[in-house]
């Protein structure tokens, strides 16, 4: 419950931390004597309490809770929740064998998604190019190349590879995404901003027609206004908030939504989103800034939005 302790843990300590965290979550959900306490903890967090204070308010004596957890861990039986299959709606599941090129490119795709440093990006794109040269007609291979090129900073090459992928498969989601990423990065330096961003949003608009509930087109439709220092349309703002509903785990997206809500003086909604950021144990500087803004929102009657935005962006 203490983010400060979390930050000082070793790698071994982190393993123990996550294990104990899941044990605590499981116990609070199924313990009759602790019924409702997890909801109370979440409520205290939403009121602006830090994790420790919220925990003390909800759980009481930490020593007693820890002893109960130790006993729960040693118990031979754990309570579970059964969900009958009739209560689930399962869509069609299709499985196929990877094509040869896809299999060869799988390591590149995994490393791209996991993230690489600048040196690793240059190494990865060389490998991706060699594979892509052997499988020029495989759209998945070309879209994976596009991703590697973008990560390496090669926007023009990423766009070319995306186009090759889309020429073979006009429903390749990753190809649209990588093309959009590259065009948006190019647009930052374009002399004709209006034309550049109109071109940049096109792949995301095309993706939106294929996947209406994909969050990235909704997010980038908002970004194009902000990047040009224009006031976002109501449709763009609503789309941004819908994107957060679709991807609530995305801290960067939540931050963007909170900024927009502060600009619009919708402080109640901004508080909800900032609360989720403020006490995130992984939050770093953003968590500290969010806590400061929350204090201002709750302690002052006439808050200047520009001052709050400045705090968050510092």
Q: At which residue positions do the language-model features occur?
A:
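TPR/TPR-like (Sel1-like) alpha-helical repeat modules
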Residues: 196-205, 262, 267-285
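TPR alpha-solenoid repeat register
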Residues: 141, 175, 216-218, 253, ...
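Beta/coil-rich, acidic/histidine-enriched accessory regions frequently appended to metallopeptidases
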Residues: 47-188, 269-272, 290-314
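Active-site-proximal alpha-helical
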Residues: 1-52, 206
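Short coil turns that delineate tetratricopeptide repeat
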Residues: 136, 170, 212-213, 248, ...
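Canonical positions in the second alpha-helix
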Residues: 131, 164-165, 206-207, 242-243, ...
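Alpha-helical adaptor scaffolds
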Residues: 113, 147, 177-189, 193, ...
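TPR/TPR-like alpha-solenoid helical repeat scaffolds
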Residues: 180-181, 218-227, 259-263, 285-305
